[in-house]
Amino acid sequence: MIELKRSFCRHFPLYSHFLMLLINSNIDVVFIQVTEIGRALIFLLVEYFFSKFQSMAPRPLRLTYRRPPPRFLFIILLIFIPVSMVGIFTYGQKISYFFRPLWDNPPPPFKRLSHYYAENVSMDHLCRLHDWSVRSEPRQVYDAIIFSNELDILEIRWRELHSLVTKFVILESNTTFTGIPKPLFFASNQTRFAFAEGKIVHDVFSGQIAAHGSREDPFALESKQRAAMNGLLQLAGISNGDILIMSDTDEIPSSHTVKLLQWCDGIPPVMHLEFRHYMYSFEFPVDYSSWRATAHVFHPRTLYRHSRQTDLILSDAGWHCSFCFRHIQEFVFKMTAYSHADRVKRRDFLDHSRIQNLICQGDDLFDMLPEEYTFQELFKKMGPIPSSCSAVHLPAYLIENADNYRFLLPGGCLRSPE
């Protein structure tokens, strides 16, 4: 036991340094120290058992039960505690997501509204299929988004809706949701959107820059921007009875969905819009899990939100293309800027070659498990997203300009660095 204690004392500074790294979250150095600790533990055990082996003398065999000596328990704890801390620190989120079906319950199911559409079918007939009636004139439509850096997706969205929307209301901030200063991407690229000039209502939100070495609460900053959108909508001239689309930039309602809401009477005052979810491009369809976008018949108490507001959802109403960027640097920006930036657990998550490989594989950028409430769905969605060769039923502008948007179509997974 004396030899064991002496060996432990020689390596104790290494353990102490490692624990301090965990406390200070110096992630890159932690993984180097894990290797060193493992080597130290091996040397410690070898020294201990070798000394015990040397001191052993032949003894008659005794078939009696002996309690495990305290020194053996000490060795087990010496190994178990740091390894457990590393495992929890590194894989805690993944472990939590794996056991989510045991500790969390799914939200109440939506009441799905059937959605009918085909080309060259009259609006009167489409309204009646939904048990609505056609209007004598269309409602005005306001499309309101909080913008970050998705310039390509923004153009596809506005081209899809341009003929139907009265005002495009866009709010951008000079900081990210995590309090990092950022350029005004839309303001510096307005000439690209000259086709919508006259319909654009744009404003800048003065964000709060985080103190050096800290981060602002991303959800609090996001909430403040959504509150600022309410005032901007009033400035845009929205009135009672107008249609208001609330969604993120990459949640794109289809033009025929907006036209249906614009021309039909009897629609629900609030409904969610179900979008087909894609990851990285339209080559990787995930499922129909995107539900946060909403369509409102505006009234004075309508507030801009991105959470569940009703049990009604209109099926197959558009597209949600997450992380659909042209350049690798745009992926890096979003990974560190948006509300879930805490998912970047290691610096190598932002490595350009790693990101490029994961895009082409359809695998998760954050090395996370799917957020599911049953083990059946969890196992079904684990691993890379199967790629698709279909580019049917996508935004018209995307297909018309396929050469410029090859990175969003099947077979175009390679990205340029910047």
Residue ranges, per PLM feature:
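Short beta-strand-to-loop acidic/aromatic patch adjacent to the donor-nucleotide binding site
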Residues: N240-I252
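Active-site-proximal specificity loops/subdomain of glycosyltransferases
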Residues: T176-D242
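C-terminal accessory extensions appended to soluble enzyme cores
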Residues: L61-Y65, I313-E418
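Juxtamembrane luminal stem/stalk of type II transmembrane Golgi/ER carbohydrate-processing enzymes
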Residues: E3-L4, F8, D28-V141, K380-E418
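Active-site beta-to-alpha loop of glycosyltransferases that engages the nucleotide-sugar donor
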Residues: P138, Y142-R159, S163, S173-T175
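Short, acidic, metal-binding catalytic loop of nucleotide-sugar glycosyltransferases
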Residues: R157-K167, L171-T175, P183-A187, R192
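Conserved catalytic core of nucleotide-sugar-dependent glycosyltransferases
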Residues: E251-D351, I355-Q356
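Structural motif
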Residues: Q140-Y142, K167, I243
